[in-house]
Swiss-Prot record:
It comes from the Bacteria. This is Indole-3-glycerol phosphate synthase. SUPFAM superfamilies: Ribulose-phoshate binding barrel (SSF51366). The keyword Transcription regulation does not apply. GO terms for molecular function: indole-3-glycerol-phosphate synthase activity; phosphoribosylanthranilate isomerase activity. It comes from Burkholderia cenocepacia (strain HI2424). Gene3D superfamilies: Aldolase class I. Pfam families: IGPS (PF00218). The keyword Transport does not apply. Belongs to the TrpC family. It catalyses: 1-(2-carboxyphenylamino)-1-deoxy-D-ribulose 5-phosphate + H(+) = (1S,2R)-1-C-(indol-3-yl)glycerol 3-phosphate + CO2 + H2O.
Amino acid sequence: MSDILDRIIAVKREEIAAALRSTPLEALKLEASARDLRDFVGALRAKHAAGNAAVIAEIKKASPSKGVLREHFVPADIARSYAAHGAACLSVLTDEQFFQGGVRYLEEARAACTLPVLRKDFIVDAYQIVEARAMGADAILLIAAALDTPLMQDLEAYAHSLGLAVLVEVHDRHEMEQALTLKTPLLGINNRNLRTFETSIQTTLDMLDMIPADRIVVTESGILSRTDVDTMRAANVNTFLVGEAFMRAEQPGEELARMFF
């Protein structure tokens, strides 16, 4: 695990302890049960069936490696723009300390459109999965670099029991082997090196030989141009999670359409 990931996970455990004190698990479960769900995987498959790229468009104000990406940050407006320009789903950062995200951003984005929403955070405990359901998420992220295989399997099973989709994220072939023990069809390959923070889309291409045909490869990070998109689609990678390229554009939805459609 990288130093930054170690620090983030330590903070997450502190946040979970504080959240449990303010909202016990059973109370949170009641909130979660009142939320409706949108079909995250189905939205991706519908784009594929129409011959299109399936874009999980990210709403992200900042990152540890790049700092603030977008000063004028109105999640509801960004969500509407993404929906109007062909996104399949949304991804919303809810981590506050490292990414300047927030639960309210996910709630605002989901209320502004009909797209399914991924809670983008560092999930290490079942409490966060109930939290995700309660805030209106339709899917969660599990990061293989942050979890051992048995815990990852347990968290996936719990998420599925609540009706949530799971995107499992890997950075290398060893993590892909772990991810392939899960049931989820969604395999995210993060092109960012966790130690150097550099990105290379070759990371995704180099792992395609490991992936069964019934899984959906989601390429993440470093997709910055139409050329990157074309390279991936030529390799039959048709699902993309993109944040930075859109967040830096004056009109995020228009940039999505320019890159993908």
